[in-house]
Curated annotation (Swiss-Prot):
The lineage of its organism: Bacteria, Pseudomonadati, Pseudomonadota, Alphaproteobacteria, Rhodobacterales. The gene is nrdR. GO terms for molecular function: ATP binding; DNA binding; zinc ion binding. PROSITE patterns: ATP_CONE. Its cofactor is Zn(2+). InterPro entries: ATP-cone_dom, NrdR-like_N, RNR_NrdR-like. PANTHER family: TRANSCRIPTIONAL REPRESSOR NRDR. It comes from Dinoroseobacter shibae (strain DSM 16493 / NCIMB 14021 / DFL 12). This is Transcriptional repressor NrdR. The keyword NAD does not apply. One of its GO terms (biological process) is negative regulation of DNA-templated transcription. Negatively regulates transcription of bacterial ribonucleotide reductase nrd genes and operons by binding to NrdR-boxes.
Length: 155
């Protein structure tokens, strides 16, 4: 593994352990050339996925991009990082087990929204605001009003 700090190709594994509920291996590495320490994760990839964007453009599925978008939506929310890691791994496993290699971005967005709705409403709304391209406060009002159960009062 190449050192991200100095580019040396001879790094050493100092510690390996299961991560993300035993679906990944976490490795702590050390670079003898510069003394840098870094962590890598090794995961099973069942199949290479391709995302079909709404424009029709195709791009390779990027787990890191998915993780970044979810972590941005969940920033400063009271959810354990391990729980997010498990959720992200579950989303990826679900995508890989769909039987298709080409997956529309809309499908990925809906799966992410389902998962976020189960763990944190605020993160769910934040993600939806980007995914559904909210343009005004009214978009938020409409979306949030659909989340609330009816009060039984006539307006």
């Amino acid at each position: 593994m190449r050192c991200p700090f100095c580019g040396n190709v001879d790094t050493q594994v100092k510690d390996s352990r299961p991560a993300e509920d035993h679906v990944a291996i976490r490795r702590r590495r050390f670079c003898p050339a510069c003394g840098g320490r870094f962590t890598t994760y090794e995961r099973v990839q069942l199949r290479d996925l391709v995302v079909i964007k709404s424009s029709g453009k195709r791009e390779d599925f990027d787990r890191d991009k998915l993780e970044r978008s979810i972590r941005i939506a969940m920033q400063k929310r009271p959810v354990e990082p391990d729980r997010l890691d498990q959720m992200i791994s579950g989303i990826v496993r679900r995508l890989e087990s769909m039987g298709e290699t080409d997956i529309p971005s809309a499908t990925i967005g809906e799966i992410v929204m389902e998962a976020l709705a189960r763990i944190d409403t605020v993160g769910y709304v934040r993600f939806a605001s980007v995914y559904k391209n909210f343009q005004a406060a009214d978009d938020f009002d409409k979306f949030v009003s659909e989340l609330r159960p009816p009060t039984g009062k006539d307006s």
